[in-house]
Amino acid sequence: MWHAISRTSRMSQSGCPSGLLADKNISSSATRVIVKTAGNQKDFMVADDISVRQFKEMLLAHFQCQMDQLVLVFMGCLLKDHDTLSQRGIMDGHTIYLVIKSKQGSRSLAHSFRDLPTNDPCHRDRNTKGNSSRVHQPTGMNQAPVELAHFVGSDAPKVHTQNLEVSHPECKAQMLENPSIQRLLSNMEFMWQFISEHLDTQQLMQQNPEVSRLLLDNSEILLQTLELARNLAMIQEIMQIQQPSQNLEYPLNPQPYLGLETMPGGNNALGQNYADINDQMLNSMQDPFGGNPFTALLAGQVLEQVQSSPPPPPPSQEQQDQLTQHPATRVIYNSSGGFSSNTSANDTLNKVNHTSKANTAMISTKGQSHICATRQPAWIPALPSIELTQQLQEEYKDATVSLSSSRQTLKGDLQLSDEQSSSQITGGMMQLLMNNPYLAAQIMLFTSMPQLSEQWRQQLPTFLQQTQISDLLSA
């Protein structure tokens, strides 16, 4: 059987309630709950395991209203119908705030609180031990803003958002701009007690004791927090700054470092990008041969590069073993004409800290022997002379420059150099031009003019004969 004892809202001259409930005959299984409304408060004796819905049904007989009009608030949180009082931590002597919504549903809770009486000078708060305690408010503070503060701190937007206009940002802005709320937030003593007695705050302080020392014991930090809560424009600005910083890792439309310094971790991300670029530049300068990302730009400077297949088996097994053991070998053919071709069998990546050396070898191709320079890493031993056969020409036929064309060019260049060196007349002519630069310049001028070059060609035998006579006289 539930017992209800009504308590009037009239206060004595001392500012305390006129009558207190003597609960000497209360059994241990029952709980005394104080229900506080806008005009009065009542004490109810309920069971420990009673649900919120059953408690609302009990309140309907006293307040003459419907079930959907009742809203119960405890410790800044709305009580749901399926919850029990013991689950929400409601114990003996705790205070539950009752809000009765209008039947039309047009008036918001903020508007209903504005019409509350303001003649009560003090407010009775909850106490876990069942004793009454008083929190004296400054002059001009009334009971209605205290109840409103409890309700504003609740999770009202999560439940019954279709009927509560408090979930709208406009209503929240009006509540924060209310002078009564501003005066309430400016009261440091009341806010300290309100925050410390909140259930979530108590759990937070139990898990993190440094929060109580940092926030509650430090009046300056608490004052800054309250100033931030009173300034709605500053809260909106912080939300706008935090919103893009959450998606900084995967931005939809990334801007080139736009406002990066104002975002958390912006300077760190900017410095990391600069550090990566500097590391790549330093690595390329200190290690120009291995892992250099800029070496690909020099690929166009190579005249002709031929990538060959594995080498054919030579006649001897010893040479075959040597070829398989030395995959990186470069052969450069040089002739008097200045022609060179570069052939690479397999360039390895581990040639960073190795220098290259040149060895000479004889290569015979159809009776023509030529001297070539073989470039290989220093850690590879020198290769013996390898005879290139006709099979090499078939393997390199798809290359940019074939060995057959290079052999013909080398042969022609060698024959031309032999003819030029064997001719005494040509040798004397070249010596004369070297000794007389002015004469060489005139000859170049004559070659550019057809008429002068024809006359020079006709007089050339006489000129050569005179030069031979002068050489004999000088000898």
Curated annotation (Swiss-Prot):
CDD domains tied to this protein: Ubl_PLICs
Domain Ubiquitin-like: 31-105
InterPro entries the record matches: Ubiquilin (IPR015496), Ubiquitin-like_dom (IPR000626), Ubiquitin-like_domsf (IPR029071)
GO BP annotation list: ubiquitin-dependent protein catabolic process
Gene3D superfamilies: Phosphatidylinositol 3-kinase Catalytic Subunit, Chain A, domain 1 (3.10.20.90)
GO terms for MF: polyubiquitin modification-dependent protein binding
Region feature Disordered, mapped onto this chain: 113-138, 305-325
Biased composition (Polar residues): 129-138
Cellular compartments per GO CC: cytosol
Protein name: Ubiquilin-like protein
Taxonomic classification: Eukaryota, Metazoa, Chordata, Craniata, Vertebrata
Gene symbol of the encoding locus: UBQLNL
